[in-house]
Amino acid sequence: MTEGGMITLNIDGVDIKARQGQTILEAARSARFYIPSLCYYPGLKPLPQVIPDEACQLCVVEAKDNTVANGNVVLSCVTPVSERMVVNTGTPRIREIQRKNLLAILVRQPTDICFEKRNCELQKVIDYVGLKEIPVHVPRSLPSSTDNPFFVRDSSFCILCNRCLRVCDEIRGLGVIEPAFPCHKACPAGIDIPRYIRLIARGRPNAALAVIRENVPFPGVLGRVCAAPCEDDCRRGQDVDRAIRIRMLKRFPADYGDDSWKKQAKTLPSTGKSIAIVGAGPAGLTCAYYLAKLGHKTTVFEALPEPGGMMRVGIPEYRLPRDILRSEIQEIEKTGVEIRLNARVGSLDSLFEQGYQAIFLAIGAHEEMKLGVEGEDSPGVIRCVEFLRRFNLGEKVEIGNRVGVIGGGNVAIDSARAALRLGAERVSIFYRRTQKEMPAQSEEVEQALEEGVEIVFLVAPSRVYSENHNLELELVRMELGEPDASGRRRPVPIKGTEFIAGLDTLIAAIGERPDIPAGFQLEVGPGNALKVNQDLSTSREGVFAGGDCESGPALVINAVAAGRKAAQSIDRYLGGKGDITEHLVAAEEATTWLEDVPTGGSLATISYLAPQARIKGLSEVEQGINWETAVPEAQR
C-alpha cells in the first residue's frame, strides 16, 4: 500500500521503499543498487531531453507491474516506479542488450585506450556489463599536433570528455580558459565556427567572412557543398535541441559579405623559391594559395581544361554554380599563383629539372572501382567519374530513357540527378543496404527523391547482359548481417531472389581510388593511396602529397585542410617557419556571461527550387538564407 507518498517495489529480489514519481533508476540509486548509465556522457542526449534512440540505453531493466508487461525491457531513467513493481537489473537478456548498446558508444573510442591499456572513462561500465572487445572499430583520422616539444596531442583519441582538463586542474593545478568548442574541433580546416557565428548574430557578415577566410580560400564553395562534420558535433544539437545550420551560415557571409577582408591580407616578399603543384583541385589550390602568400613562386599543373578538380568536374552546377567557383579561384590567382591547364604530369624528374625545389601532389582519386560482376564492361555501362566529368564539362552524353545507378554515396546521387537533367524518364539507384546506411548526405538523398529518382534498397548487381543495344541488369535481394570494416552491417545475398531490370544506361558509382603514375616512383599503400609521413612528405625527397590521392576519397573540407598542412610543411622544408596564420579581422569582445538557453527555436528555413523546375536545367537548387533568417539562426 502507498503510505505518505511512499511505495514498495522489488529490485533483484529485495523489497525497497521509493517515493512516488521517482524513476526506477532514481529509486535504485537511493537503495544503493547499481544500474549503469551515461546520462551526461559527451555526444549523448542528457535528461530531461532524452530520446530513447539518442540516449545511452545502458540503464535497461526488466520490469513487471500492472502497467508494464511481464518481463518487458524498459529504460529505467524514464520509467516511473509503481506499487509492487518487480525489477530485474542483471538478467542475461539485459546484459546482452547493455553490451550491444555500449558497443554503439565505444565504436567512437580509441581501441587501445579502452581495451589494450584498460584506462578510459568507461572502464567500470565495460567491466560491469562484461564486454571483452570491440569487434569492429573504425578509427578516426584526425591530425596530430607535434608543434609542442613536450608532448604529442593526437586528436583522433579525443572524445571531448574533458578528463585531461580535470587532471591538469585538480592534480597539477594548471587551469585552462575553456575546452575547445566541439564544432571548431570537428572542422578539419580549423575554421573558428563559434566566432563567425557570433559575428553573424551581431549583424556583421563582412567580419564573419574575414574569419572564415583566415582558414580557407573557398568560403562560397564550402558554404554550398561542405558535408559539415561540425554540425554532427554541434553542442546545441547534442545538449539542447537541434544543431545550428553551420554550413548555411558559412554561405551567408560568402553571399552577402564584401571584400573588406582584403585590407588585412598580406603577401610576403619573394623568397626566390619555386614549387610545382600537380592538380588544381581543392588541396592543390589551397596549398598554392598559402605558399604564394608566403612569397614562393607557385605553379599548378592541371590535366583538365578547367581548374577546380572534382569541384569543377565532379560536383554538378546545380549544387555549385560555376561563377562562385570561378571567382574564388581567381582570388587565388591574384596572389601570384600560375595555373597551367591541359598540362598532364607523368614524371616528377622533369619538374625538378625545370628548377622546382619542391613538389606537392594533389591528383585526387579518379580510378573507379570495378563492380566485380560478369558483363560490367558491356556497351551502355559507364563509370560515374567519366559520366560526371563529361556532364559537367558540357559534353554530349547519350543515356536513353532508363538509367540505373549502382551505389549509395554522394557521387551516386549526383549521377542520378544529372541523368534526370539529361532527359532520362526513369532513374533508379540500386543500393545494397538500407537508407539508414547510405553514406550520401541526407539532404541530397531527399532532394533526389523529390526530383523523381527511385531508390531500390537491399539489392546488389550480380550480372550485366547487353545484346542488340538492350541492357539488362540482374540484381539479387540482400539482407543485413554482421558489421563489416566500415562499421555498417554487411549485406548478404538471399538465394533465389534474382530479378532483371531493363536499362538503357548503367552508371557504376561504388567508389574511387587514386591512380598514381608509375613515373612518379613513389611508395603506395592500401587502396593505392600514396604513403606519406606525418608532415605529408613522401618516400621521395622534396615531394609531398595530400588530399584524396593520400587519404582516399574524402570531403572537400578535408582536401582544403590537407592543402593547408602541405603548405606549412613545404615552407618548413624550404627553410621557412611554416606559419600561414592570418588575422583578417580585429578581435571582438565575446559574451562573458551565461544566459538561459531557450529550447524549441525553429531552424532557419532554406528555400529550394521546385522539383519540376530543377530538372529542366542547371539552376542552383539550394537558395541559401537571407538576413531575416541568418541572424536569428546565428543567435540560437
Model segments located where?
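Rossmann-like dinucleotide-binding cores of NAD(P)H-dependent redox enzymes
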Residues: 297-340, 391, 416-463, 578-593
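Glycine-rich Rossmann-fold phosphate-binding loop(s) that bind the pyrophosphate
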Residues: 279-282, 408-409, 548
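Mid-to-C-terminal Rossmann-like scaffold of FAD/NAD(P)H-dependent oxidoreductases
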Residues: 446-452, 460-467, 471, 479-481, ...
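Feature captures the FAD/FMN-dependent oxidoreductase FAD-binding
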Residues: 200, 207, 269, 274-278, ...
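A conserved FAD-binding loop/helix module that cradles the flavin
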Residues: 415, 549-577
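Glycine-rich dinucleotide-binding loop and its adjacent helix/turn
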Residues: 253-269, 327-342, 368-422, 524-541
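Fe-S ferredoxin-like electron-transfer domains
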Residues: 52-299, 303-304, 311-318, 365-367, ...
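FAD-site-proximal beta/loop scaffold in flavoenzymes
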Residues: 377-400, 483-553, 557, 561, ...
